């Protein structure tokens, strides 16, 4: 490798001998970083693991397992959506809110049951900090028809 290219990139090759762990498997890992200023720059990562050759008994059992139909787990039914639908009008019931008893529209509802304030509401009027949206709990909003 020329001295100029050594300053702009490097290649790392790691071969871990099997005698260290006492096992019989071999693994090879190659990582290379090349200079970023060339148009052909790329990152190459290659990992290979050699497995012991399969015996005739394990070979026949693998074909039997492949021939058997794979069981697909039954998909869970989706739970009903939490909170008001997106775009619906809601009245704010949080007393300390700037928009208390005002009506705003729902922007989004987080469907995670662990979220404390899942309902994002946008208002036509901005508050003292020039903000027009806020998050509310499910019990702090009431749908308006």
Swiss-Prot record:
* GO cellular component terms, A-Z: chloroplast; chloroplast envelope; chloroplast thylakoid; chloroplast thylakoid membrane; mitochondrion; photosystem I reaction center; thylakoid
Region of interest (Disordered), ranges: 50-87
Which SUPFAM superfamilies does UniProt cross-reference here? Answer: Electron transport accessory proteins
Q: What is this protein called?
A: Photosystem I reaction center subunit IV B, chloroplastic
Q: Where is the composition biased (Low complexity)?
A: 51-77
Q: What does it do?
A: Stabilizes the interaction between PsaC and the PSI core, assists the docking of the ferredoxin to PSI and interacts with ferredoxin-NADP oxidoreductase.
According to the lineage, what is the superkingdom?
A: Eukaryota
Subcellular localization, per the record? Plastid, Chloroplast thylakoid membrane
Q: Which Gene3D superfamilies match?
A: 2.30.30.50
Q: Which family does it belong to?
A: Belongs to the PsaE family.
The membrane topology of this protein is: Peripheral membrane protein
The GO molecular function terms of this record are: protein domain specific binding
The GO annotation for biological process reads: photosynthesis
Q: What is its main location?
A: plastid
Post-translational changes noted in the entry: 2 isoforms may exist. With or without the N-terminal alanine.
Key words, A-Z: Chloroplast, Membrane, Photosynthesis, Photosystem I, Plastid, Thylakoid, Transit peptide
Pfam families according to UniProt: PSI_PsaE
Q: Which gene encodes it?
A: PSAE2
């Amino acid at each position: 490798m020329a001295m100029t290219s050594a300053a702009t990139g490097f290649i790392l090759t790691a071969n871990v001998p099997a005698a260290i762990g006492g096992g019989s498997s071999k693994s090879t890992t190659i990582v290379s970083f090349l200079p970023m200023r060339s148009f052909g720059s790329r990152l190459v990562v290659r990992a290979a693991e050699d497995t012991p050759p399969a015996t005739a008994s394990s070979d026949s059992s693998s074909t039997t397992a492949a021939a058997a139909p794979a069981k697909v787990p039954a998909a869970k039914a989706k739970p009903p959506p939490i909170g008001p639908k997106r775009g619906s009008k809601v009245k704010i019931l949080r007393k300390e809110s700037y928009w208390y008893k005002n009506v705003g529209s729902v922007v989004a509802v987080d469907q995670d049951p662990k979220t404390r304030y899942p309902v994002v509401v946008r208002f036509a009027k901005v508050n003292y900090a020039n903000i027009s949206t806020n998050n509310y709990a499910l019990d702090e909003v009431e749908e308006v028809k």
